[in-house]
């Protein structure tokens, strides 16, 4: 069992039951999935960009991402339907908890001028989104072997009904909120 998964069962669940007064353990919010998404609009000109991004996401997530394709043609962006324009990977279960552990304890402290993540990035339904400007904050990525700095979006989906419940859940996982 992953370290954060054990931590969730032993420390987070009792803490949230006490804070919000849940009657059942099944009412306690939990993280269902973490989605990593890399939008690569510049990949229209060069197919090698997609391969490098897929390689980076594979190292970061520990599983192979799916290449996302354009749903419809947009002449202004010079893309046609079916063009590869991004890569995404969905993490669940053990891989999700291991990624969350690495992200909170190792990757976030490596961000330059880091003062904490925003507490306002919740969507109103208990899900949290965070944008990472450069993939080199992850220790799996070797700085000398990357071709370009790429950002990615990390979406944390929870079963929480409100943003307050979701924030309490993530804060109990030692998420460094600044406000």
Swiss-Prot record:
GO cellular component, one term: ribonucleoprotein complex
BP GO terms, sorted: translation
GO molecular function: rRNA binding; structural constituent of ribosome; tRNA binding
Gene3D superfamilies, per database record: 3.30.1440.10
InterPro entries for the chain: Ribosomal_uL5, Ribosomal_uL5_bac-type, Ribosomal_uL5_C, Ribosomal_uL5_CS, Ribosomal_uL5_dom_sf, Ribosomal_uL5_N
PROSITE patterns: RIBOSOMAL_L5
Signal peptide: none
Keywords: Ribonucleoprotein, Ribosomal protein, RNA-binding, rRNA-binding, tRNA-binding
Protein role: This is one of the proteins that bind and probably mediate the attachment of the 5S RNA into the large ribosomal subunit, where it forms part of the central protuberance. In the 70S ribosome it contacts protein S13 of the 30S subunit (bridge B1b), connecting the 2 subunits; this bridge is implicated in subunit movement. Contacts the P site tRNA; the 5S rRNA and some of its associated proteins might help stabilize positioning of ribosome-bound tRNAs.
HAMAP family: Ribosomal_uL5_B
Similarity-based family: Belongs to the universal ribosomal protein uL5 family.
NCBIfam families named in the record: PRK00010.1
Subunit structure: Part of the 50S ribosomal subunit; part of the 5S rRNA/L5/L18/L25 subcomplex. Contacts the 5S rRNA and the P site tRNA. Forms a bridge to the 30S subunit in the 70S ribosome.
Official protein name in the record: Large ribosomal subunit protein uL5
Organism: Burkholderia pseudomallei (strain K96243)
The encoding gene: rplE
């Amino acid at each position: 069992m992953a370290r954060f998964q054990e931590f969730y069962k032993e420390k987070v669940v009792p803490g949230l039951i006490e804070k919000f007064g849940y009657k059942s353990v099944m009412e306690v919010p939990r993280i269902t999935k973490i989605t990593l998404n890399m939008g690569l609009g510049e990949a229209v000109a060069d197919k090698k960009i997609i391969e490098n991004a897929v390689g980076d996401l594979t190292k970061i997530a520990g599983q192979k991402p799916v290449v996302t394709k354009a749903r419809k043609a947009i002449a202004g962006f010079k893309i046609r339907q079916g063009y590869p324009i991004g890569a995404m990977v969905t993490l669940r279960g053990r891989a999700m908890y291991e990624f969350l552990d690495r992200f909170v304890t190792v990757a976030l402290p490596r961000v330059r001028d880091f003062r904490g993540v925003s507490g306002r990035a919740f969507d109103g339904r208990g899900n949290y989104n965070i944008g990472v400007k450069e993939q080199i904050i992850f220790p799996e990525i070797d700085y000398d072997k990357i071709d370009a700095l790429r950002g990615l979006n990390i979406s944390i989906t929870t079963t929480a009904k409100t943003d307050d419940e979701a924030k309490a859940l993530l804060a109990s996982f030692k998420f460094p909120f600044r406000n």
